């Protein structure tokens, strides 16, 4: 009798995706982040669901309801901090996952890569709207500053911003709709993740060498299930260390002050995972130019497959490209640091140089370096 795992319509899909899936035998720990992102998404949906049971999306009670969750709800504090720090873990895994794709040339699976970019935008939008919900000072002013950027769009800008606000400023209508979107978008992300996986399984996984591995595959279970469990345990360990020992390490103290439209905080800044993009936005003195640079800093990923000039897929055997890649990582860390600093000398200049370097590496230096490496190898 055939195994039900291989015949049942639903079990068959799970079997072909997570059990009998033919996988390259040499994929490293950098391939763990896909499953870790899935775990992060499930964790965020579950903790978010329990938070939504006690949260009220009204300007007069939102801040109090979050305080109530932390003080009065059974284990509300741990749910709240797992959700807040879970978002940080989510973005750490996201950036590692995208970095892996860039390093090993996984972007040559264009459908998977493009769905991934849409997923990235979806999760960024979700995180931004979630940051507004506690209705602290940084929530309110962050929402005001970021939504105001849309007013840079010629002709329709102002009307568009007021349409998103649901009034003439960030107020009750804005908070209610942000809560609605913050609740629905993770489910959209789940559907997109399924499509992401569907396209990946059409081609099979890439591997560190970049060489096709069709002739040499191993089943996903037990080899990679056990490896993913180890990754998941490490993820949960780091998350719980954060939650239980320093839950506010990555947050902003200003968000413990209730939102006050009459008092602007001295330094308005987003959560740490958006600081690199915020630094790029601030480094351009023109409003529209800044908004375009902000969008392009992520959208640039979409044209990476078109800029692939190397005859090798990954960077495993391309030392000059490797140096450029790590320079890009250092540049992004510099931008993250600059995004959290006040707008004054020397931070302005450093931010502008780091922003120029970011686009230079991706658009100019990497394609040229790949051509040079091809010539060195006489390919």
Curated annotation (Swiss-Prot):
Q: Which cofactor does it need?
A: heme b
Could you tell me which SUPFAM superfamilies the record lists for this protein? Answer: a domain/subunit of cytochrome bc1 complex (Ubiquinol-cytochrome c reductase), Transmembrane di-heme cytochromes
Q: Name one GO biological process term.
A: mitochondrial electron transport, ubiquinol to cytochrome c
Q: How is the cofactor bound?
A: Binds 2 heme b groups non-covalently.
Under Gene Ontology molecular function, one entry of this record is: metal ion binding
A Pfam family the protein falls into: Cytochrom_B_C
SUBUNIT field = The cytochrome bc1 complex contains 11 subunits: 3 respiratory subunits (MT-CYB, CYC1 and UQCRFS1), 2 core proteins (UQCRC1 and UQCRC2) and 6 low-molecular weight proteins (UQCRH/QCR6, UQCRB/QCR7, UQCRQ/QCR8, UQCR10/QCR9, UQCR11/QCR10 and a cleavage product of UQCRFS1). This cytochrome bc1 complex then forms a dimer.
User: Which family, according to UniProt?
Assistant: Belongs to the cytochrome b family.
What is the role of this chain?
Answer: Component of the ubiquinol-cytochrome c reductase complex (complex III or cytochrome b-c1 complex) that is part of the mitochondrial respiratory chain. The b-c1 complex mediates electron transfer from ubiquinol to cytochrome c. Contributes to the generation of a proton gradient across the mitochondrial membrane that is then used for ATP synthesis.
The name this protein goes by in its record: Cytochrome b
The encoding gene: MT-CYB
